[in-house]
Amino acid sequence: MKNIALIFISLLIITGCSSESDLEKYKEHVITLSSDEFEGRAPGTPGGVKTKNYIADHFGSLGLESFGDSYLMPVNLTGVTLDVDQSIFDLSVNGEIIDIVYRTDVVYGTTRQVESVNFTDSDLVFVGYGVNAPEYGWNDYKVDVKGKTVVMLINDPGFELRGTDFKGKAMTYYGRWTYKFEEAARQGAAGVLIIHETAPASYPWGVVENGWSGEQLNLTFAEKNLDRSALEGWITLDVAEKLFAEMGTTYEEMKAKALSKDFQAIPMEGMKLSSSMVNTLKVSDSHNVAGYVKGSETPDEYVLIMAHWDHMGVDPTRDGDQIYNGAVDNATGTAA
């Protein structure tokens, strides 16, 4: 690119595949990064270090310039690991705690970077898609949910409506779980439970189960993320169907109600959540890897091309193969 600077952020390796030779190089990078040698590429592990060095070495071979004396840019991370055996997730219906199994029926934790989080008797409220999108004239939060636990659908209404609302089947940011947790926190919710459904999520429950159990890494925040909801989690479609049946309705009926701009959040009468979470915190340092090609005409302008290099590492509790190799997520993006 002649007129602007092109920047490659680590999250990545970029070579392009404009020829058969480039395609072979791309495939080689994918195979290498997703091999057992890289141990699942988890930050703060030997496999993560090997991954960063691999990317930096390749940037050097391409002749990319660096920001400073290294392609490595430090990032401080905090890992939060839920002690499941010491933690409590009590979902009750009319005073009776229902049987819910961690990982099989629910995954949960906290984004707050603290050793313990507790709340009791938080009323459940179904908030449709959990979306507040003024540009689409859409607001699922027309009631006060402060201190309550909001239950919501994955994706955004466009996935089902397929019309002009949102972007049809293509997910907007409003459909992502990251947004849903952020918006629930802005609304003051104590807890957030996303209902998993494979088609609108675009991945099966196993992805949620594996991704949300074990250590959860985030940037280290001075305020310890205390502005986030106390509990963030997912429940299976089967659990949601049972809860809605207790309300005398069905999942499909509730979803149909949520597909209207006039939707009003629905209290899930008699249903409450109490939780006590015990966490182990681990602070570690990792790096982004960044290099750039300076433009000849406007060298102070940049085009960013990014991909995350990390994956889920190794799970020693698993039987058999314990390495999450992460070819699709995200060796393919890193090698692109």
Where do the protein language model's features map onto the residues?
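Noncatalytic luminal/extracellular "stalk/propeptide" segments of secretory-pathway proteins
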Residues: E39-G163, P267-E269, S286
